[in-house]
């Protein structure tokens, strides 16, 4: 993170170090918004020595141009920072008013076979640059990283933060330690994906012999890739041959839908397969997996007929699943 320049500098540095060590730091939103809050305090309270309730409440107040969700995104890093200080007895400031989360209606992109072929063809055709280590690393990593998302349904964050010790290349199992809600779970890899990871591990180890992260970032001294890296590379590969809008997270949706679609003519064992899918995708309760009912035409009726259970489609925010 950029250097803090307000009276909060020391506490912000300690907070950032703690979040990074806990694998809870989000470069895309935390860094930007915490930096803006730091500048706000420096400008408006140049003589202050301690954080006050007024500073926090004024900054976190919902602006006229903001929706509830955009306000939540802007202030969450500050709320987290305040909670960090309070848990250590460094402040008595209470949480500011946090707007209620708005449920968004979201229909993810439905991939066609042609689009997926185009996308992975683009991933496989990244040009060589033997003298540029970062480009060599990118050429090795991008095709494997996105195939892992496609074939396993893991979240983009889970893939980014995989350590080498989390990937069992002997048994073909991923240990997902950092997940939404921090629920550890395991994912069994398809044989073809396991073989690809073995080849990748051999190639990337020559560039990063003692790497900590399974997918190391040259620009971060071997640390994990950022959310922006995933988004930018997906966008570049996607639009090379495709036109419709899509985002990386939708590979997870595709994984769930393809699995569920393949079961619709099976009565026996349907519930067990749904439970397995739920666990492998890191859902703490099977109700979370019901979100995908709304994405497969007629599936709710099929499930009700096969399991004698009413498939009630929950109102959820897609990013939660």
Q: Where are each of the predicted segments found?
A:
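Conserved catalytic core of the tyrosine transesterase superfamily
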Residues: 1-321
């Amino acid at each position: 993170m950029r250097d803090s320049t307000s009276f909060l500098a020391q506490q912000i540095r300690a907070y950032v170090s703690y979040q990074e060590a806990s694998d809870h730091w989000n470069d895309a939103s935390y860094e930007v918004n915490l930096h803006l809050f730091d500048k706000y305090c420096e400008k408006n309270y140049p003589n202050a020595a301690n954080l006050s309730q007024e500073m926090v409440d004024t900054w976190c107040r919902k602006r006229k141009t903001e929706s509830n969700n955009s306000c939540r995104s802007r202030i969450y890093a500050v709320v987290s920072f305040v909670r960090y200080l309070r848990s250590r007895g460094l402040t008595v400031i209470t949480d500011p008013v946090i707007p209620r989360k708005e449920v968004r209606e979201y229909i993810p992109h439905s991939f066609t076979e042609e689009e997926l072929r185009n996308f992975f063809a683009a991933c496989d055709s990244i040009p060589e640059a033997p003298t540029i280590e970062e480009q060599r690393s990118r050429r090795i990593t991008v095709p494997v990283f996105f195939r892992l998302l496609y074939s396993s349904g893991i979240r983009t964050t889970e893939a980014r933060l995989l350590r080498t010790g989390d990937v069992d290349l002997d048994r073909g199992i991923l240990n997902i330690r950092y997940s939404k809600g921090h629920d550890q779970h395991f994912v069994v890899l398809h044989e073809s994906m396991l073989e690809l990871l073995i080849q990748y591990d051999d190639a990337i180890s020559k560039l990063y012999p003692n790497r900590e992260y399974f997918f190391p970032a040259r620009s971060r001294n071997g640390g994990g890739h950022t959310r922006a890296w995933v988004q930018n590379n997906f966008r570049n590969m996607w639009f090379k041959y495709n036109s419709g809008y899509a985002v990386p997270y939708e590979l997870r949706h595709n994984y769930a839908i393809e699995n569920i679609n393949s079961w619709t003519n099976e009565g026996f064992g349907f519930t067990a397969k749904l439970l397995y899918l739920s666990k492998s995708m890191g859902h703490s309760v099977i109700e979370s997996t019901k979100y995908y009912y709304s994405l497969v035409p007629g599936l709710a009726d099929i499930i009700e007929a096969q399991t004698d259970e009413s498939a009630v489609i929950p109102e959820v925010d897609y990013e939660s699943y």
